[in-house]
């Protein structure tokens, strides 16, 4: 039958059994069958070390740093203490200062992160995020099929989200108990990506809230753009990477009060 309206499934895609719902009651039936353990974006230690060695630092002073996180690297250490932005900067600043993560990006997402070096700066930056004075822009690549939907070139998506308790880390649209999630978008135009120069549509995404997987769900859900981001293994189809990138970040430096603005291309 059809998937529940809270689920995001794309017609024609194969979705393996999941650990959350299926394995506890059907383990004996799943022997020899692919089980989705929701760790599809996991990167081995060797790859993570290589990613950490080419971490790009755009700005650094005694109070904060702005870095470009590559796709495949964690923002903070996982359960197996994998390499992360946090651990790399802790090592870099060892004996000088600590690293305080102000915000995070999914492992599969690339782009800009600001990291504080003192607890006071950390609190001040977090307050800016709470007051929504921090400006963020993401760039994503969508399949050409989005052009067939004849959507407005600019728009606003409001779909409340909550975690799926039986299928983590997936999020679901929950109009009863979900937290407000608001995204503005602007279609930019056609582009190419990857070694094969495949065609896609570039879109700018402006999150006005910061829910887990917000941009991914708002793109994929039928009541959003109904078009998953290319490479989104949770809500669409796998590819060489998730083509979602935090391209612009703007905030006020808590110490100098200077307005800081950073850009990095996808």
Tell what function each PLM region has.
Residues 1-266:
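RNA pseudouridine synthases
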